[in-house]
Every structure is written in structure tokens, then in C-alpha cells.
């Protein structure tokens, strides 16, 4: 927004501090094993302090400002990953940052109007894993207007994903009928989503964005 660079990055290298961060990411081993953990934050604190020190009246304690800063932070994070990987580094996104934001806020001592958005681990990779399966490009592209998905299109677009040996095994070991049930019933349940939504909203209020 307005070239304000509404993001900050907290670099965690210290082993003890990585250990403190780990529970916020459900103790995924990569948090403590990677040389560096980077937490990308939506940051309107810096801009607000600039305004206050320049006889200006900031008005960024609201949800729209959070969305603008979160967008900035994610764009910067992905750009950083692209550049890092071009230099031979490996990155891995942790999808847990917005699940327990308050504990990350407390651990990293984030002030008001700063909110954790994305976390990556960074280092030189010692392996080259295969890329995860992706939906076909035509499943995400809509020409001119949004075209909703018929049952036939869903069958077409998810056929490859549902029929990889890994995913078929995933369904079997979880005693489910379909891969979708693994996601809705086990991995990302309505109950968990609602509970985590509540804690995330509370953290947004605590940080001054609501």
C-alpha cells in the first residue's frame, strides 16, 4: 500500500529461542533443526511511529490496514523465497503461523500493530524432494467471470490428486472413504477452524487491528 513496506521480519537463529518458538508451530522438527527461522509480520507499528514523529495523525488500527499489511508481508515473503532459492538456499513454509499467533507474538515480543503472517525455515538443503502434486492450471483460471465447479469438473480436476499412491494410502490408513474426508474430518475440521478463528480474532484485537 502506497510503497509503505508494511512488513517486518524477525530472524531467529539462537537454539534456545527456536525451541521457544517450536510449540507455536506444533513442535514441527524443522523449527529447531533449520539454521534459521524467519517470521514475516504485518507491521503498521513502524509507519504509525513515523507518522507520530512527523506531526501526522495515523489511522491504521483497523481491519483494512491489517489486510493491506498482511498482503504486503506475504508478497515480501514469497519474493524472498524466490530470491533465496535462486541462490541455492532451501525454504519451507510453515502453515501454522496464524493458528497460534498470540504465542508467537509473546515469544517474539511483537508490539501493537504487528502481527505474524508467515514463517519459513531457511538453510542449504541436503536433499531434493519431488514436488507435491498440483491441481491442473485450468482448475484455477477463470476467464472474464468466475465459473463455478460442476461435479464433472471436480472429478476431472481432482482425479490425479486422488489417485496418487501416497494419497490413496493416506485414505486407507485413516479409514476414510475419500481423500476429501481426510481433510474435513481429520486434518482441518470445522471445530478446529472455529476454535482457531476465535483465538486469531482475539490476537488481532490484542494487537490493535480490530
What positions do the PLM features span?
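Acidic, surface-exposed loops and disordered segments
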Residues: 1-210
Amino acid at each position: 500500500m502506497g510503497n509503505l513496506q508494511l512488513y517486518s521480519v524477525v530472524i531467529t537463529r539462537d537454539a534456545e529461542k527456536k525451541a521457544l518458538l517450536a510449540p507455536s508451530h506444533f513442535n514441527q522438527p524443522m523449527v529447531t533443526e533449520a539454521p534459521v527461522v524467519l517470521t514475516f509480520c504485518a507491521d503498521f507499528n513502524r509507519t504509525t511511529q513515523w507518522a507520530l514523529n512527523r506531526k501526522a495523525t495515523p489511522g491504521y488500527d483497523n481491519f483494512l490496514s491489517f489486510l493491506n499489511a498482511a498482503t504486503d508481508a506475504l508478497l515480501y515473503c514469497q519474493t524472498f523465497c524466490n530470491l533465496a532459492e535462486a541462490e541455492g538456499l532451501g525454504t519451507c513454509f510453515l502453515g501454522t503461523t496464524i493458528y497460534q499467533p498470540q504465542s508467537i507474538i509473546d515469544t517474539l515480543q511483537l508490539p501493537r500493530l504487528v502481527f505474524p503472517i508467515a514463517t519459513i525455515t531457511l538453510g542449504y538443503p541436503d536433499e531434493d524432494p519431488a514436488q507435491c502434486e498440483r491441481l491442473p492450471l485450468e482448475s484455477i483460471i477463470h476467464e472474464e467471470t468466475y465459473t463455478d465447479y460442476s461435479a464433472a469438473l471436480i472429478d476431472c480436476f481432482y482425479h490425479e490428486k486422488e489417485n496418487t499412491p501416497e494419497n490413496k494410502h493416506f485414505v486407507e490408513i485413516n479409514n476414510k472413504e475419500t481423500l476429501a474426508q481426510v481433510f474435513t474430518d481429520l486434518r482441518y475440521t470445522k471445530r478446529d477452524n472455529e476454535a482457531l478463528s476465535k483465538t486469531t480474532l482475539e490476537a488481532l484485537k490484542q494487537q490493535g487491528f480490530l
